[in-house]
């Protein structure tokens, strides 16, 4: 009696497990995804003992495991369905036989065996899950490799373009870096050159400052000397007579009385009446003045003498060359006359052979005189001979004029050289006489004027490019009333030398 209700209860439990609607599953699988494989208890008796009639649903799968278990959900469910169907069949068969043969102990043994089978299946399931996870990872790697292998040509072209742009940018960056380095080197060189220039300018400025200091000191010394000289001047004026003082005050700084004369007058200790200088001082001053004048005249005479010697040498050389050329021309003319005479002698011999000399010998003295006198027929030949002679004379005159012009140019060159030497010596003398002029401010101007006259050369003002103009300038030199040297030079050579 007890076995019958037990079988009915087991059938109810099996019906409850087979029917999804009994446990509230409306087709969604109790919150599970369709096709999923989840753990389901196989033994109905253990289910009843642990949970009773209401069995709790299995836990939901985790998110990381959802995707890994999807491929095996269907196979797991299929395996469990097979096992559950076999269990159901066995239970039904056992339920039919349990009423007669099986007991509780046998059922327990079978349940224990079923649990062992479930554990074995669990271990196999775990191994298969691990294999599936490895295969899924391999599939992921293969998918990523396939995605990389299936990269489009557009991405490849873009990659090539980016690589080319990168190379071009690297080249531009290298060029810009080289330019920057070059500019830096150039700027460094420019900076060094400017630093050197600034240093040079500083050195030059220092030297110029030192020179300026020296010049300022010299100017101060000169001013002090000028003050001393002014004081001496006033003292010398005080020592002179009233008339001489008036003359010195009325006239300009350059007077006939030189500083040397004033020094001589002031050096004399014997004074005349009224503080005037004595006669011996005046005589010494006048003699000193005469000595200076004579020295200056002597120098001018020496210069004029040297210039006369130079001009004489130049003209002598020119005249010797002219005479040599004239002698050569005379020799050529003599040779021509000899040739003409030989030709006439040969013609006469030919005429004698032809019988002309008999008629010529028969000419009387009157015929010979008529032949000598010019006639109308012979006037043309004579005119031709005269024209030839005039042309020859004109050519000779032109040659002489050119030779004289060359001689004059040589003379002018000598004179210019001499004038330059005189200017150099005069400049050196002026440099030497600067302190003397400061110590004696009342030096007369006639010495400077004579030096200027000595340096003046009227030949320099004449143009030497045209020979005839040079000859005219020699014949009629310009006269300067202030300079006696030009008069001596104009009279140094006679006018007959130019026309022989």
UniProtKB/Swiss-Prot annotation:
Keywords: Coiled coil, Cytoplasm, Phosphoprotein. Residues 101-237, 286-314 form a coiled coil. GO terms for cellular component: cytoplasm. Residues 10-23 have a biased composition (Acidic residues). One of its GO terms (biological process) is negative regulation of Rho protein signal transduction. The keyword Coiled coil applies. Its main location: cytoplasm. It is found in: Cytoplasm. GO terms for molecular function: identical protein binding. Residues 1-105 are annotated as: Disordered. It comes from the Eukaryota. The keyword Membrane does not apply. The modification Phosphoserine is found at residue 492. InterPro entries: CCDC125. Residues 92-101 have a biased composition (Polar residues). Expressed in many tissues, with highest levels in spleen, thymus and bone marrow. May be involved in the regulation of cell migration. This is Coiled-coil domain-containing protein 125. It comes from Mus musculus.
């Amino acid at each position: 009696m007890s076995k019958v209700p037990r079988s009915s209860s087991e059938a109810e439990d099996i019906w409850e497990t087979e029917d999804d609607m009994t446990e509230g599953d409306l087709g969604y699988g109790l919150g599970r995804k369709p096709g999923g494989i989840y753990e389901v208890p196989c033994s109905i008796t253990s289910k009843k003992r642990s949970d009773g009639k209401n069995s709790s649903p299995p836990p939901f799968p985790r998110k990381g495991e959802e995707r890994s278990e999807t491929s095996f959900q269907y196979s797991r469910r299929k395996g469990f369905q097979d096992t559950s169907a076999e269990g159901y069949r066995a239970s039904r068969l056992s339920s039919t036989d349990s009423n007669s043969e099986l007991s509780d102990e046998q059922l327990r043994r079978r349940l224990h065996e079923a649990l062992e089978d479930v554990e074995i299946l669990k271990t196999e399931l775990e191994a298969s899950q691990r294999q599936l996870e490895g295969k899924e990872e391999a599939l992921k790697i293969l998918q990523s490799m396939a995605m990389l292998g299936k990269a489009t040509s557009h991405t490849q072209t873009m990659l090539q373009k980016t690589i080319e742009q990168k190379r071009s940018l690297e080249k531009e960056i290298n060029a810009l870096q080289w330019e920057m380095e070059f500019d830096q080197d150039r700027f460094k060189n420019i900076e060094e050159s400017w630093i050197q220039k600034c240093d040079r300018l500083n050195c030059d400025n220092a030297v110029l400052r030192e020179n300026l200091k020296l010049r300022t000191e010299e100017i101060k010394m000169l001013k002090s000397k000028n003050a001393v000289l002014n004081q001496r001047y006033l003292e010398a004026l005080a020592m002179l007579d009233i008339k001489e003082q008036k003359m010195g005050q009325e006239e300009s700084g350059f007077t006939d009385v030189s500083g040397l004369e004033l020094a001589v007058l002031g050096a004399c200790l014997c004074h005349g009446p009224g503080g005037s200088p004595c006669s011996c001082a005046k005589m010494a001053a006048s003699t000193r003045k005469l000595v200076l004048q004579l020295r200056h005249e002597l120098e001018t005479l020496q210069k004029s003498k040297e210039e006369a010697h130079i001009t004489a040498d130049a003209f002598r050389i020119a005249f010797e060359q002219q005479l040599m050329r004239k002698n050569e021309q005379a020799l050529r003319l003599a040779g021509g006359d000899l040739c003409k005479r030989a030709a006439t002698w040969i013609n006469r011999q030919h005429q004698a052979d032809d019988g002309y000399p008999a008629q010529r010998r028969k000419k009387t003295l009157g015929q010979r005189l008529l032949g000598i006198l010019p006639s109308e027929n012979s006037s043309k030949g004579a005119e031709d001979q005269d024209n030839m002679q005039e042309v020859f004379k004109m050519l000779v005159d032109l040659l002489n004029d050119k030779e004289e012009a060359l001689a004059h140019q040589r003379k002018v060159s000598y004179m210019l050289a001499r004038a330059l030497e005189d200017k150099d010596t005069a400049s050196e003398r002026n440099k030497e006489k600067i302190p003397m002029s400061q110590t004696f401010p009342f030096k007369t101007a006639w010495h400077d004027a004579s030096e200027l006259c000595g340096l003046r050369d009227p030949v320099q003002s004449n143009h030497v490019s045209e020979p005839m103009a040079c000859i005219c300038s020699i014949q009629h030199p310009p006269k300067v009333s202030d300079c006696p040297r030009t008069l001596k030079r104009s009279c140094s050579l006679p006018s007959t030398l130019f026309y022989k």
